Amino acid sequence: MISNAATSTPDRLTSTVRKTYPNFKVIVLNDDFNTFQHVSDCLLKYIPGMTGDRAWELTNQVHFDGLAIVWVGPQEQAELYHQQLRREGLTMAPLEKA
């Protein structure tokens, strides 16, 4: 016997929680062997949107303050920029959550 009665499903309360991916800081540390020019050139080469003036400001910050945050963004990109700068011989702090 087949029933023609309508079936109902219970109403569900669904909600989607969206979490943003955490950003990470790429931090260059001061050292005694990299020149101002080399640090500035590396920032220009690897950090997107970097200008010559900004690279020089950050290089001075590295020298006088001991460190500078040169880029903040998604982890995967931060890891790439960190690795590229380290490969060029810059002294890098570990990535930090922003």
UniProtKB/Swiss-Prot annotation:
Gene3D superfamilies named among the record's database cross-references: 3.30.1390.10
One Pfam family cited in the UniProt record for this chain: ClpS
Superkingdom to which the source organism belongs: Bacteria
GO biological process: protein catabolic process; proteolysis
Protein task: Involved in the modulation of the specificity of the ClpAP-mediated ATP-dependent protein degradation.
Family assignment from sequence similarity: Belongs to the ClpS family.
Assembly, per entry: Binds to the N-terminal domain of the chaperone ClpA.
PANTHER family according to UniProt: ATP-DEPENDENT CLP PROTEASE ADAPTER PROTEIN CLPS, ATP-DEPENDENT CLP PROTEASE ADAPTER PROTEIN CLPS1, CHLOROPLASTIC
Protein name: ATP-dependent Clp protease adapter protein ClpS
Natural source organism: Synechocystis sp. (strain ATCC 27184 / PCC 6803 / Kazusa)
